[in-house]
């Protein structure tokens, strides 16, 4: 169904988009580091909450992408467009609700999640959280539209929009932080403006009726409960999985925040830099939703396996190069962030250990996207949620508080989480039970 040229056309823009996202994330942290470690720490704490929200919205978009991909596999573009309208409606309403909660509960939520943190860190976190919350509805629109274009195998639209969004963000950061000396607000305001621009651009483009999947030109999205249920059947388990994953990271971040500013800053910078190692798997995972979803929709189970195996091999090939480069360059890269010697030492150690452990990651996080594309979302959710609470959270507290391993204990617990997921997902994949055993029309909940 997909030639290697088709796969390259889908995956290369996705990888570029992921690179852009990581580079902009790095630029944010580097620029705000000029304000001080308290600013870096405040932004890092808020980013862990924002990532939870973003992953929740992304899971809903994934549900829509799976439904649309399976309809396209069955050559049913009409229902694919109906699903697109309902996806846009659902994600926007959810994002507005989340924004209101975040704006109203600003300081209370931060205090509830992270407990007693230093006053200057809290002040920076409050400012950044407020501005981040305003951007959530725009980001939801962008994510939903990007997912729709990926389901068509057209990822160029989202990467071009992402390029525009990130350019606005970086230029805005430089102007507001270095030129206007606005501190953390100088990072937050360009985030709002850039995400608003991206959301509006994608909303204009996705209304084009010439595209295989499109939404109503006048945004008369309608209300189709059955179609929304189809999307939620995929999106809710994926959302619970992603939300629990990010909630676990927040709880771990709360644990790290008790270790002092140097540990928070070192942990934040290490997390920022190792994002490069996630790039191929994240992009390939997004591509799997399209490729495997269409194969399953068309009933081509053998091809679904074939493409999954091929994409995992590509993931490992790119990852090997990135891991070697990041390990070799870890010290000079950390030096960019203007950290204290203690924080720099922590960051370098975390990066080196992380690079070796990444051999587990593709099977733990890229492979389950193939299962989700085949609607096998309950298994991935149960496995991920159990692993998160047992290993990433539970073991982190044991290693940090019981064995006094500091932030390295958090890293070790994370690797244990990866290993458990990888074993169960690999067994599930090899068994073939992730593939639907019923007529394909049921795969999208008709």
Residue ranges of predicted features:
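Residue-level hotspots within the lipid-embedded alpha helices of multi-pass solute transporters
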Residues: 18-22, 55, 95, 99, ...
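Helix-terminus/linker motif at the lipid-water interface of multi-pass membrane proteins
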Residues: 23-41, 110-119, 175-182, 243-276, ...
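Short alpha-helical transmembrane segments in multi-pass integral membrane proteins
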Residues: 1-14, 68-135, 168, 177-236, ...
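Interfacial/gating helices of multi-pass transporter permease domains
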Residues: 32-51, 119-127, 184-185, 226-234, ...
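N-terminal transmembrane alpha-helices
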Residues: 2-30, 34-35, 51-63, 92-99, ...
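Small-residue-rich hydrophobic transmembrane alpha-helices
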Residues: 40-100, 139-158, 264-330, 361-384
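Short runs within selected transmembrane alpha-helices of multi-pass transporters and secretion channels
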Residues: 61, 131-150, 158-166, 187-202, ...
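Transmembrane helical elements of multi-pass membrane transporters/channels
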Residues: 9-25, 131, 165, 194-198, ...
């Amino acid at each position: 169904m997909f030639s290697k040229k088709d796969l390259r056309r889908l995956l290369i823009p996705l990888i570029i988009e992921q690179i852009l996202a990581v580079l902009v994330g790095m630029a944010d942290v580097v620029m705000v580091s000029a304000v001080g470690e308290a600013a870096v720490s405040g932004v890092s704490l808020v980013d862990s909450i924002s990532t939870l929200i973003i992953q929740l919205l992304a899971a809903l978009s994934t549900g829509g992408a799976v439904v649309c991909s399976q309809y396209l596999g069955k050559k049913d573009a009409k229902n694919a467009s109906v699903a697109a309208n309902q996806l846009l409606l659902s994600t926007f309403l959810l994002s507005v609700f989340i924004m209101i909660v975040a704006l109203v509960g600003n300081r209370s939520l931060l205090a509830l999640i992270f407990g007693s943190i230093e006053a200057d860190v809290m002040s920076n976190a409050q400012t950044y959280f407020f501005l981040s919350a305003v951007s959530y509805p725009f980001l939801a629109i962008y994510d939903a539209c990007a997912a729709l274009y990926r389901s068509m195998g057209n990822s160029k639209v989202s990467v071009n929009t992402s390029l525009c969004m990130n350019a606005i963000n970086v230029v805005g950061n430089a102007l507001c932080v270095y030129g206007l000396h606005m501190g953390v607000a100088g990072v937050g305001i360009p985030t709002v403006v850039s995400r608003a621009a991206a959301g509006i651009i994608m909303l204009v483009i996705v209304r084009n009726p010439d595209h295989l999947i499109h939404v109503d030109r006048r945004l008369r999205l309608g209300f189709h409960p059955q179609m929304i249920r189809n999307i939620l059947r995929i999106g809710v388990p994926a959302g619970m999985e992603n939300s629990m994953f990010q909630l676990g990271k927040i709880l771990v971040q709360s644990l790290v925040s008790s270790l002092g500013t140097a540990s928070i800053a070192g942990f934040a910078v290490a997390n920022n830099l190792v994002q490069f190692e996630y790039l191929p798997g994240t992009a390939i995972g997004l591509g799997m939703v399209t490729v495997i979803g269409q194969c399953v929709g068309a009933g081509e189970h053998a091809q679904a396996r074939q493409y999954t195996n091929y994409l995992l091999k590509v993931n490992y090939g790119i990852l090997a190069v990135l891991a070697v480069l990041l390990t070799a360059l870890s010290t000079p890269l950390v030096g960019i962030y203007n950290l204290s010697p203690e924080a720099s030492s922590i960051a370098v150690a975390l990066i080196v250990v992380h690079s070796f452990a990444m051999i587990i990651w593709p099977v733990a996080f890229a492979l389950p996207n193939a299962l989700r594309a085949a609607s096998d979302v309950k298994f991935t959710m149960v496995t991920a949620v159990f692993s998160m609470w047992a290993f990433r959270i539970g073991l982190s507290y044991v290693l940090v508080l019981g064995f006094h391993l500091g932030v390295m204990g958090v890293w070790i617990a994370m690797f244990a989480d990866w290993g458990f997921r990888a074993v169960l997902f690999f067994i599930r994949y090899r068994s073939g039970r992730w593939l639907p055993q019923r007529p394909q029309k049921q795969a999208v909940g008709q």
